[in-house]
């Protein structure tokens, strides 16, 4: 006889992974379970609210395990958009995706623009013919903050605002709940999910098994002079600011709201304790504005573009580049999901669905979680004698 599914699930982290886990727990066919979610500041207040929201079917195909996760998640995004009215609720839409080489210096172009280049992009912005990277069948987008909040709201989860101090573990090695700063006692749980992005490693139960590092990424959001002229074309740019300088790889995502999101300028850096204190670095923000102006006169501040946001966030990274999804070795009922790097919004749904199956059914069916198990790091530490 199989064990009964847990009745009390506490999710730590109100980003896309935590929200999707809450949704799939609550909508589980056989054992629907509405969880409690603990979030330090507000749902989607960190990377899940400041990411680009780009979705790709097959861009992870070079890594088989990640390919299966990404393809399952891309399909789930379409299903969720149908179920939750994603087009209106959080800007879900298929997009065209292009690779564009920006010239280092302004160039007057007498030749007609390349037919692949959308009309809102200046003809002089492309130093070579653009390449098609994705079609509306293989690439799409969401507004990540709105998506995260919509999925969380649909789950019906109780949201507790507070900082998770530690995971409480019973004498028999089974999870007992979480301790929240400033809250008396333990928030009882039969199962705990740690989905705290780059902050996951601050908890001892995680840091004893593996490390999570941060990658600081900058972004700006602009409202162009004529937003109605901006078409759903996502641009992956290559740009060398000066001869001999490092090649930059910024990205441009127009949104259905008429806003345009531009990101790039990343560096390895661990996040501060409080997500609410994160700010962008002036030089990185200035470079993104420079790049935006090279792409389109519609995106130049001096020509009427409105600055909606200048911001930064931290992406969670692991030593081997793969996410960590599964039960933490030695702590029965304590699960972790982090390390998705720049693919967190894409892979959030399949991660949440797989965790819900693992917690309620005892095994994930939507995708094989073995390659993502935190136990893989125990083997490596053992080989190193750690």
Swiss-Prot record:
- One GO CC term of this entry? cytoplasm
Name the positions where D-serine binds.
Answer: 253, 261, 332, 362
Membrane-spanning regions, if any?
Answer: none
Which residues of this UniProt protein bind FAD? 14-17, 39-40, 51-53, 174-176, 332, 344-345, 362, 364
- Mention any Pfam family matching this sequence: DAO
The entry's D-dopa-binding residues are 332, 362
Q: What is its EC number?
A: 1.4.3.3, 1.4.3.1
Which residue ranges have biased composition labelled Pro residues?
112-121
Q: Which UniProt keywords apply?
A: FAD, Flavoprotein, Oxidoreductase
What GO terms in the biological process aspect are recorded for it?
nitrogen utilization
The record, for PROSITE patterns, names: PROKAR_LIPOPROTEIN (PS51257)
Q: Which domain of life is it from?
A: Eukaryota
Tell me, using the record's free text, what induces this protein: Expressed when grown in presence of D-alanine.
Q: Which GO terms describe its molecular function?
A: D-amino-acid oxidase activity; D-aspartate oxidase activity
- Described purpose of this protein according to its UniProt entry: Catalyzes the oxidative deamination of D-amino acids with broad substrate specificity. Enables the organism to utilize D-amino acids as a source of nutrients.
The record ties this protein, via PANTHER family, to:
OXIDOREDUCTASE TDA3-RELATED, SARCOSINE DEHYDROGENASE-RELATED
Q: Which family does it belong to?
A: Belongs to the DAMOX/DASOX family.
In Swiss-Prot or TrEMBL terms, this protein is called D-amino-acid oxidase
Question: What is the organism field in this record?
Answer: Zea mays (Maize)
Its gene is: DAO
